[in-house]
Amino acid sequence: MKVLGIIPARYASSRFPGKPLIDLKGKSMIQRVYEGAKKSTRISEVIVATDDQRIFDEVQRFGGKVMMTKESHPSGTDRCAEVASHFPDMEVVINIQGDEPLVDFRQLEQLIDAFIEPKTDIATLGNLSLTQEDVDNPNRIKVVVNAKNSALYFSRSAIPNSHHSKGNPLENYPYMRHIGLYAYRSSVLQELTKLEPTALEKIESLEQLRWLYHGYSIQLVETTIETPNIDVPEDVEKVLEFL
């Protein structure tokens, strides 16, 4: 199976501008993400996709592969699709978030394994090691799944809501945190970019809700590997503890 790893990276993040270029103990965040992805021997090619010259120059500086993309892309998925269109021989594309400096190659290979099943369109990761603070934090995305581990819904809110339950909600239900790494069959990735945005996607600010709304299945792969991401400046200190 030929697998393309793409790291979409933009400078103008609303919550943390310039995030890909922050220094994490001597290396930029984008370099740490790239190097983590390159550790997998099952990914044929790893490429950073950006529309910013500063990020482009940084990737070239540390010797990584990078492609400049259109500025008009509304999401990282669209940016990935543009790059993937140049690699028609790739069967699976992994969207490796540029804010995951601790990405573990074993997580990526768990996603690849999901495509052994011919019916898998999209796969993503989740883990069950949430704290109550995580459950209440809108920057920690929660997901609920069905009996076959396909996603039913993603939310920034605590789902399911436990207002009728007594005691600690975490003792009553195995809350799952979504880890924002995605893999797609190449043909499906190109289809996703043609879908119309939906009200659910807009109100939650979660593009994967568009795919669910339009009938695509998202397979959740449970991982026990802990990889804190950097969504806002306050997350940096937590990541530095792991380096």
Residue ranges, per PLM feature:
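Conserved core of the sugar-phosphate nucleotidyltransferase
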Residues: 104-195
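A conserved hydrophobic position in a structured secondary element of the catalytic/binding core
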Residues: 50-51, 103, 184, 231
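Short, high-confidence coil segments that cap the C-terminus of an alpha-helix
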Residues: 43, 89-90, 117-121, 216
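Conserved alpha/beta core of the MobA/IspD/sugar-nucleotide pyrophosphorylase nucleotidyltransferase superfamily
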Residues: 170-243
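Short phosphate-binding loop-to-helix
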Residues: 47, 53-96, 100-113
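N-terminal glycine-rich phosphate-binding loop and ensuing alpha1 helix
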Residues: 2-49
